[in-house]
Amino acid sequence: MTAVALTLRTGTADRLAGHVAMQLANLFPDESMDADVDSLLQVVPRALERMRPILAAVRNFDPGHFNHLNSLQYTSFLYLLANERWRAGARDALAERLFCLNRTLNAVDLFYAVELPQVFFVSHGLCAVLGRATYGDRLVFFQNVTVGRVGNESPVLGRDIVLFPGAQVTGNSIIGDRCAVSAGTHVHGLTVPDDMVVFGGPQGIVLKPRRKDYIGLYLRPLND
């Protein structure tokens, strides 16, 4: 997809940084607002660059416009801000406060030290927890989803994965490419081949060949 100029609802990156700083000052005060703005301006441009492939991929988003009042977009943006602060090696409280802000405003647990893929779509992600795991690109997840390690064992998720509401992937599970985990299904310590739909029921886990392009319901094709 050809890159397009990115416009902001706030108009400028400076105003966007000021908006985030005001929320931090009201909910998680620590530094002065001016200090927060200065620190945020170091990471806002990089976070916006990382929003570009997300905006371009998600069907319901305008590829050329970032709207901080769209809670789905803002959830991703706050994670990216905190993650950029972490990547930069800053060990002050700003990344932690941004993480807390995201939890408070959007009720998601996206820890700043967790590396999510280039394209991820938080679709109504209330109470979702995405923890330590290896994530393939183009991930879609819904509310009450849990991904995380058990002890020292962490999941591996392939590309083009959809985690429907209440899905859980834990331990040393391996989920192949283009798979979907159905609502309320807990995958623990299992290997799932490519192109499968995972169902959970009274008889345990059932794997069925995928007959639908689930990722295509939410993300544009790569060649769009």
Predicted feature locations:
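Terminal amphipathic alpha-helical/low-complexity segments used for targeting or macromolecular assembly
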Residues: 1-106, 211-224
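Residue-level signal for alpha-helical context at structural boundaries
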Residues: 58, 62-65, 134, 157, ...
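Left-handed beta-helix
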Residues: 73, 87-138, 144-156, 167-168, ...
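Amphipathic repeat-derived elements
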Residues: 43-48, 149-150, 161
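N-terminal alpha-helical segment
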Residues: 77, 121-122, 162
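Glycine-rich hexapeptide-repeat left-handed beta-helix
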Residues: 150-152, 157-224
